[in-house]
């Protein structure tokens, strides 16, 4: 049972549930102090033991009579700029006189049942007030009149704290918010390894680790989206922490725009974590009476290793961040035409591809880029969301009806935020793009970014998309974004509000998503940004799944999907079987390995099934039958990482159903070897007293045996090849089905 307690006599707040505690207090100068975040502690009135302070050389002090109280050496909850603390602040305000000094002092608090919604922003939520409690702490800067509210939500079921901040200009003069983090967390030591998920296009969310030392470790984006380069996620783990044991802290920012996450280790090994909107180029003007709300950040603690941390994020995000009709539904198996045809298609060819897909058991056919306006290549058409009648003489309405007549659902690709200069939209409204007066406007993929900070632009795109969705039988939307933002300037905003454009842009994206998902609640949205360039929690609030990466090669996907699973549920990962040679790395991998990787996600095909052999079609049908039978557990089960592709030639992961009567293990080996050692892997999450049948070889083992000795994964590479055994090759994989048969009682 979660609880929020305020001890009046010591002015200490204690938020706790069965697994975690979060403790903060009001310091003697009225600021908030950070005392503890971690494993559940017994509650008591006085935690002053956790406040460490002493006099230090070369230190500035608040009070002349107290040479122990300096903000430089006290752990704080939401530190301000420039008042005896030389570390990076959580908030920085520019006042009309040029000062950047603030002093937010405690005023009051309130405890709210459930969780309030954040206006205009994605955030975790509750479906009943009994699921969570929210603490709102009010602080005020007496000189400027600015009022600050810090929000903390603690959940019953999750080892997580959701945090955000809100500021109101209750004074008489303008303020400029130059920096306002979603959270700040001061930890008492630096004995952590920092983990980030980084990469580039088609190599997203690779796991990168480094040891924290004095100084700053940071990731960020200034691209206008969360980016391929750095995901808005970080983890701190103790040096002895592995996947299944040890302490880990995870921080995830529910935001899709420019962000910054950093760890700053000071001179005495205190670690300050901050996460929020990137302050670079950010300047939000607050006139008297105006307010600003930060995005939400989620803080997770695990004493059960990285798997424990990930499972908290995965379950919380699958159930209390993703929303709507599709949140809990098994996702349809789809066939996307992009790598099958690119821009070279006709209506009849699309129907031919869809017909074969239906024959194989596919449920959804998706028409990707190239169907609209003058779009015959990537230089024209974006912004004109009207069907090209030369390609589609019956329009989207007619095509969707033909697809549905086959017994399939129909999906469609959009890139709502972009425009080509060769388009009717640009010719009519050349001022609707983000562009800096007097400067060259850069393109990406020959396209330009619409100014979604302007309501009339968002309204126009909404009107075009809603018209198509209303008139046609569209069950799925793939929403793409194929370039980053440059020359960020809005002709609609005055000069003193240009620092707001990046954030206003992403608020416009959220607004369009919100309107479309509200009006068309049964349409399944999949987010995309040249693959995984905006694969973040903010998107998950509107689109319950995202295209994980444009790299669909099975071997490349091992690292991509392994890293992605650090924070995101399997139900959010778009994962497809594509053609060989693969179009990104030109590798040939077996059809079964391509499917064995793609099963652990939403599953689909990125090819023309008409071009497969009869034997391959038979295998595809078997794959689809398997996925339909087990997709509930594959998409919504409890996921465990067992062997990392970043550490060796083998990758192993597994998923279990809720009652642990079924486990599906994915085993993958990149390169074959000669006379290799015997191999096994210790499984996780099984019932130790249950007997499991291994469907692969019909052996039976207790759960404790499989978790302590392990599942034997040796094959013929461990010795000579018998005459009746097919030799293994490179890029080999196997799916082990473990079905619980009985529980042995009284052992």
Sequence positions of predicted segments:
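Polysaccharide-binding surfaces and accessory modules of carbohydrate-active proteins
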Residues: 4-14, 32-264, 280, 691-705
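Conserved, mostly hydrophobic/aromatic
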Residues: 19, 165, 289, 335, ...
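Glycine-rich, aromatic-flanked loop segments that form ligand/cofactor-binding clefts
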Residues: 70-118, 241, 245-258, 262, ...
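Short Pro-Gly-centered flexible turn/kink motifs
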Residues: 99-106, 284-303, 731-738
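Carbohydrate-binding surface patches
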Residues: 234, 243, 645-688
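Aromatic-lined carbohydrate-binding/catalytic grooves of carbohydrate-active enzymes
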Residues: 326-463, 476
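Glycan-recognition surfaces
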Residues: 420-459, 503-610
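C-terminal beta-sandwich/jelly-roll accessory domains of carbohydrate-active enzymes
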Residues: 671-747
